Regions:
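N-terminal signal peptide c-region/cleavage motif recognized by signal peptidases
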Residues: 19-21
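Short amphipathic, basic-aromatic surface patches that mediate peripheral association
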Residues: 28-39
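Beta-strand signatures of extracellular beta-sandwich domains
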Residues: 46-50, 119-121
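Short coil-to-beta strand junction motifs in C2/discoidin
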Residues: 41-45
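Bacterial N-terminal signal peptides that target proteins for export
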Residues: 1-13
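Boundary at the C-terminal end of the N-terminal hydrophobic targeting segment
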Residues: 24-26
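Glycine-rich, aromatic-bearing surface loops/beta-hairpins
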Residues: 107-109, 113-161
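Structured domain cores in non-transmembrane regions
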Residues: 52-115
Length: 161
């Protein structure tokens, strides 16, 4: 499980969560992403959050360990460029065609139903780039509901306990 905190939250609840961590409530959120059966090497994926204005809020996971390919995760790379801690403890192996990536992160309850969005960018070596490949509103009604992806992503969803 990846512990995840967001230093850029603008809500009063989030500020309280940062100032009074003993009172902060969080829950594990599991993001499941099924890749399409494409021809090619393993996919690099960036799973990250944006706020209600579409600004980068934090990285949940990056699949793929060769940093030279991160620039092909174009939206994530552009949005997260100023975050020098974006990769601390959140990287793993690339994901093969037709395979599934499951990421679990502890997210503050203040993020749920507050306009945040889970975004997933994907890139495959020697294939064309496009992003974002999937967007999930971080809302209670969206939990458990699959969303169709684009290009390399067949579908994705997030689940709450």
């Amino acid at each position: 499980m990846t512990a995840f905190t967001l230093p850029r939250l603008g809500t009063i609840a989030a500020a309280c969560a940062l100032l009074l961590p003993g009172l902060a409530q969080s829950r594990p959120v599991t993001i499941t992403t099924q890749l399409k059966n494409y021809n090619g090497d393993g996919a690099y994926l960036a799973v990250y959050l944006t706020n209600a204005q579409g600004a980068y809020a934090g990285t949940l996971w990056v699949a793929g360990s060769k940093a030279k390919y991160y620039k092909h995760l174009s939206a994530w790379s552009r949005l997260s460029a100023a975050d020098n801690q974006r990769l601390l403890g959140v990287t793993g192996a690339s994901v093969g065609a037709g395979r599934t990536l499951k990421v679990t992160a502890d997210l503050a309850d203040a993020l749920l139903d507050a306009g945040y969005e889970i975004r997933i960018d994907a890139a495959v070596e020697d294939h064309r780039d496009s992003a974002p490949h999937a967007r999930l509103p971080l809302t209670t009604p969206q939990a458990g509901q699959p969303v169709r992806g684009k290009q390399y992503i067949h579908s994705t969803r997030f689940d709450l306990p």
